[in-house]
A protein has these predicted regions:
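Conserved SAM-binding strand-loop segment of SAM-dependent methyltransferases
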Residues: 94-106
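A short glycine-rich, Lys/Arg-flanked "PGG" loop and its adjoining helix->strand segment in the class I
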Residues: 153-165
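A short SAM/SAH-binding and catalytic strip from SAM-dependent methyltransferases
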Residues: 104, 132-153
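Conserved alpha-helix/loop element of class I SAM-dependent methyltransferases that forms part
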Residues: 37-55
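SAM-dependent methyltransferase
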Residues: 7, 165-224, 228
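N-terminal auxiliary segments of SAM/dcSAM-dependent transferases
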Residues: 1-20
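Conserved SAM/SAH-binding beta-strand->alpha-helix loop
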Residues: 83-84
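Conserved SAM-binding loop of SAM-dependent methyltransferases across substrates and taxa
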Residues: 63-74
Length: 252
């Protein structure tokens, strides 16, 4: 995706960003959707941006469209993405704080590698606070990076580390059970599927073919269950027109 984003930014034209999955027909991501203005974003994304406050982390920021909106409002926002080309593009577009890193490895790595040899080595409260965020944004189904339900406890453990006291996670996802509806309106999930929202994808742009990756579409009830078991609660903030929703996750 990074190559497609970089080329579109430089030329304002790009070929198809194709998406493949064993469960679905070939699809494509219109690159214009990654460069939208606030006015062109879906209501759910606009609502999330309006709710963002404090120190903000924009996860999987891609081209930085959400970060730029918040930055223009004077917000303290940091964008994170694993793609070097996406990170480069965001910097060229004017995003001031950009990190090339995996969400699951963000924050406090050095202080977790070993026990301190003395009390003097313990991180100060201010230092810990600087590695935490008041709002974590995971938009455009950003929570999908978790990949599988089995990995949800790891996600909440990471929140324990980087979410500031009183902080919030604003994420959107979709209940895709409708994909498995039969003619009678009954949900018919294939027996081999552990959870109908767990899928594998691969992207292709021109001659660049990415590695397969797991992606999670999680329904709101399942998100509540997983969050509750890990000491978090979920508030359903808004529902979209395409089985999508915006959730607010906070520590109990």
């Amino acid at each position: 995706m990074g190559r497609a984003i970089a080329e579109y930014w430089k030329t304002k034209t790009a070929e198809r960003l194709r998406v493949f999955s064993p469960m679905f027909e070939e699809d494509e991501i219109p690159l214009t959707t990654l460069f939208r203005s606030y006015e062109d974003m879906p209501e759910i994304e606009r609502k999330a941006l309006d709710m963002a406050k404090g120190r903000i982390l924009d996860v999987g920021a891609a081209s930085g469209c959400h970060s730029l909106v918040l930055q223009d409002r004077g917000k303290d926002v940091t964008a994170i993405d694993i793609s070097p080309l996406s990170v480069e593009t965001m910097k060229e577009r004017g995003v001031k704080k950009v990190i090339e890193q995996d969400f699951f490895t963000l924050g406090g790595q050095a202080m977790e590698q070993r026990e301190p040899s003395s009390l003097l080595e313990w991180p100060s409260r201010d230092r810990v606070r600087r590695s935490q965020y008041d709002t974590i944004l995971m938009l455009m189904n950003g929570i999908g990076i978790v990949g599988t339900l089995e990995r949800m406890p790891e996600f909440f453990k990471q929140l324990d580390k980087i979410l500031a006291p009183g902080g919030q996670v604003l994420c959107d996802s979709s209940d895709i059970s409708y994909v498995f509806e039969d003619e009678e309106g009954m949900i018919d999930i294939p027996n081999e599927m552990d959870y109908y929202g767990e899928h594998s994808f691969r992207m292709q742009y021109k001659d660049t073919i990415g590695e397969p990756f797991d992606w999670l579409y999680i329904d709101a009830d399942t998100l509540r269950q997983k969050a509750g078991r890990c000491g978090y609660e979920v508030e359903l903030v808004a529902e979209g027109e395409h089985y999508d929703y915006l959730a607010r996750i906070t520590k109990k």
